[in-house]
């Protein structure tokens, strides 16, 4: 009933966020014209997949998709009309995309467009030429052989995307085990490849694993600094953005008067949500806090012709801003342990 219910929505979102991050949704686009196969389907497990409706190659990829147990896999078939696939992807609630049935350039363009519109979807492509995007993971590997035979990198992107979709936000994909890999070409310079935004496969005494879990972002700016290159950090950023936007749209838009008191109630709700993410997504030792944005309020007032030079900060914060809500948050995300330096004295 009213605002208390909205507050509960935000707290529920915190619980939902951690649950959802345990097993995310994967979308797979295949080139498969098997008679009787649906153009679009969703499966919760490999047991639900009708093997007879797919080619042997497609079914092999779907087995890889389910290896890490994502919550669900949306399967689409790329036909002559490629726009139909992208229209479907625009409405499907997936987290990660792998599309061996489409050109990587099309996938990269789609993901960049979706992210520019505020949707936190991501994709895994293979051996692409510098996607340079925090939403694109560029799997770079060659001469890949699995237990059941050779496979090209674009097809194996399905396995990696499924792994990333299933991975909880408490973990990084760095050194994630790839038990099905028998061999692959070794990177000539792993450090250089990682710095170039490439996700590589490395080998050790215990088998093959993913290298450092980075996305393809290489051009750093003040708005997108080094943390944006880490897959784990971007998962947290996208999750928080989506959960808060969803709660605001369902509980506030058109329903709550936009005065200062209600802005504070919204801030309180957001802070309660952020508190629930500390320790797994956010650094619990940091002051992760949202507040009404003084600069946002001031800039809006100035754009409306109001001279704020003689206004007190409290007056600016309390000022009427029409339908606009300006908030700001200072967040510190929690990465996973990946590097160790141990000094031993004897």
Task: Describe the role of every protein-language-model region.
Residues 23-25, 93-95, 120-121, 186, ...:
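Short, surface-exposed beta-edge/turn micro-motifs
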Residues 1-58, 171, 202-346:
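Structured, hydrophobic secondary-structure cores that serve as assembly/anchoring elements
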Residues 58-175:
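Extracellular Cys-Trp
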Residues 163-223:
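Extended, charged amphipathic alpha-helical segments
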Residues 26-28, 115, 176, 181, ...:
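Generic alpha-helical propensity signal that fires on short helical segments
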Residues 12-17, 58-65, 84-85, 186-188, ...:
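Intrinsically disordered, low-complexity boundary segments flanking structured domains
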């Amino acid at each position: 009933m009213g605002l208390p219910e909205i507050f509960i929505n935000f707290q529920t979102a915190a619980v939902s966020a951690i649950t959802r991050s345990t097993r995310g949704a994967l979308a797979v686009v295949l080139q498969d014209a098997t008679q009787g196969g649906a153009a679009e389907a969703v499966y919760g497990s490999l047991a639900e997949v009708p093997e007879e409706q797919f080619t042997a190659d497609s079914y092999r990829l779907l087995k890889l998709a389910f290896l890490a147990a994502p919550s669900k896999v949306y399967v689409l078939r790329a036909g002559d009309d490629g726009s139909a696939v992208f229209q479907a992807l625009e409405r499907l609630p997936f987290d990660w995309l792998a599309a061996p049935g489409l050109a990587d350039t099309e996938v990269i363009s789609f993901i960049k467009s979706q992210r520019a519109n505020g949707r936190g979807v991501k994709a895994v492509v293979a051996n692409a030429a510098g996607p340079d995007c925090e939403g694109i993971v560029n799997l770079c590997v060659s001469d890949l052989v699995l237990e059941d035979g050779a496979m090209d990198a674009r097809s194996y992107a399905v396995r990696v995307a499924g792994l990333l979709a299933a991975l909880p936000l408490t973990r990084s994909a760095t050194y994630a085990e790839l038990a099905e890999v028998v061999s692959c070409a070794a990177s000539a310079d792993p450090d250089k490849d990682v710095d170039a935004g490439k996700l590589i496969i490395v080998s050790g005494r215990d088998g093959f694993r993913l290298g450092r879990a980075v996305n393809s972002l290489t051009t750093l700016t003040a708005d997108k600094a080094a943390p944006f290159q880490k897959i784990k950090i971007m998962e947290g950023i996208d999750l928080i953005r989506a959960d808060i936007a969803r709660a605001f749209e369902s509980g506030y838009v058109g329903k709550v008067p936009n005065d200062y008191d209600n802005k504070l109630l919204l801030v309180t709700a957001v802070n309660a949500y952020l508190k629930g993410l500390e320790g797994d997504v956010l650094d619990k030792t940091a002051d992760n806090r949202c507040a009404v944005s003084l600069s946002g309020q001031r800039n809006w007032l100035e754009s409306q012709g109001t001279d704020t030079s003689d206004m007190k900060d409290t007056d600016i914060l309390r000022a009427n801003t029409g339908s606009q809500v300006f908030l700001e948050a200072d967040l510190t995300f929690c990465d996973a342990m990946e590097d160790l330096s141990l000094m031993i004295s004897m």
